[in-house]
Amino acid sequence: MNRGKEWDWMDNKKDLLICFGTRPEWLKVKPLLNEIDNYKLLFTGQHKDLLKDIEVDYRIEIGDKTNRLDQIISDCLMQFPDGDFDVLVHGDTVSAFACALAAFSRKLKIIHLEAGLRSYDLKQPYPEEGYRQMISRIADINFPPTSISAQNLFNEKADGLSYVVGNSVLDNLI
C-alpha cells in the first residue's frame, strides 16, 4: 500500500517533534518515547494540568478562549517552533490538525499516528472527522492502527507512505 515509496526511520538523523495537547494524545505517544532517541516534545495546552508531570521542549500558549477552534489553530500556526525536524501528530484533535498544518506550511515531514480511521460523515464526529481526513492527505507517513484503516487511506489515494502499526496503548498493556 506504499505506492512504491520507502522510508527508513533508522536513516533519519532529524529530531522528531512529537506534538500533543490532550491526555489521550499523551497516553498514546508516551510509549514511543522509550523507542526513539532523538525527539522533542511540543505541548499545545488543551489539558494544561498535564504539564505538572511532563517536561516539554516547546509549549504553545493558547488564548483564554480555549474552546474556540479557530483560536487554537491560529495560536499553533503563529507559535509553532522553527527547526528542521519531522513532526509527529496523533489522531484527530484540533491540536493534531493545527500542528500538521503548521508543519505542512513549513515544508516539514508530517507523520500521522492513528491515521485512516473514518466515519465518512464530516459532521459526525465533528470536527474530528474533518481533521482526520485533512491530516492524512498532507501527511508524508501515515501509521494506521488496522488494515481496514490502511485500506481507507489507499482508497482515498493518500500520497503518504502507510504502515499498519496497531494501537500503542493496547501494545503497551500487553
How would you name each of these model-derived features?
Residues 4-22:
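Nucleotide-activated donor-dependent transferases that construct or modify glycoconjugates
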Residues 25-30, 93-99, 150:
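Short glycine/serine/threonine-rich phosphate/pyrophosphate-binding segments
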Residues 2-5, 44, 48, 63, ...:
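A nucleotide-sugar donor-handling region in carbohydrate enzymes
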Residues 112-126, 140:
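A short, histidine- and acid-enriched strand-loop-helix "catalytic/donor-clamping" loop
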Residues 88-106:
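An aromatic- and histidine-rich active-site surface loop
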